[in-house]
């Protein structure tokens, strides 16, 4: 890689990581002292595999809605454009292990879901692009490898 770039993930050597993993990608402190903790929640191996858009889209809806049942510290869950994972951000919540637990509990909730929240043209910008079963399969696969989540580089 060349010079350091402004975007943290552009400075990550994607050939060195081993998905699945959850890593602290960065922190920001606001002018009033609030701290944002942004996690890279990587479901798929970069440049080798990716999530199909309907499944990813549904998983985003499900996680965004269901995670808020477990914490009031969630700021956002954002899908990565490369379709390999999500960014999950918390405010004033520095506990990595608890963040993992919130993610695990949320994905367990996904497995029990009977519908995708806000899967309609009024509440979603591409309501036709969803797959509940695909989202459940992604959640199950990620949960099955929970013992790997802390091992970003497969060491």
Curated annotation (Swiss-Prot):
Keyword vocabulary terms for this entry: Autoinducer synthesis, Iron, Lyase, Metal-binding, Quorum sensing
PANTHER family, sorted: S-RIBOSYLHOMOCYSTEINE LYASE
Top-level class of the enzyme under EC nomenclature: lyase
Note accompanying the cofactor annotation: Binds 1 Fe cation per subunit.
Domain of life: Bacteria
Needed cofactors: Fe cation
Residue positions binding Fe cation: 57, 61, 124
One Pfam family cited in the UniProt record for this chain: LuxS
Record's function text: Involved in the synthesis of autoinducer 2 (AI-2) which is secreted by bacteria and is used to communicate both the cell density and the metabolic potential of the environment. The regulation of gene expression in response to changes in cell density is called quorum sensing. Catalyzes the transformation of S-ribosylhomocysteine (RHC) to homocysteine (HC) and 4,5-dihydroxy-2,3-pentadione (DPD).
Gene encoding the protein: luxS
The protein's name in its UniProt record: S-ribosylhomocysteine lyase
GO MF: iron ion binding; S-ribosylhomocysteine lyase activity
Reactions this protein catalyses: S-(5-deoxy-D-ribos-5-yl)-L-homocysteine = (S)-4,5-dihydroxypentane-2,3-dione + L-homocysteine
Family of this protein: Belongs to the LuxS family.
A single GO BP: quorum sensing
Its EC number(s): 4.4.1.21
NCBIfam families assigned: PRK02260.1-4
Subunit structure: Homodimer.
Gene source species: Listeria monocytogenes serotype 4b (strain CLIP80459)
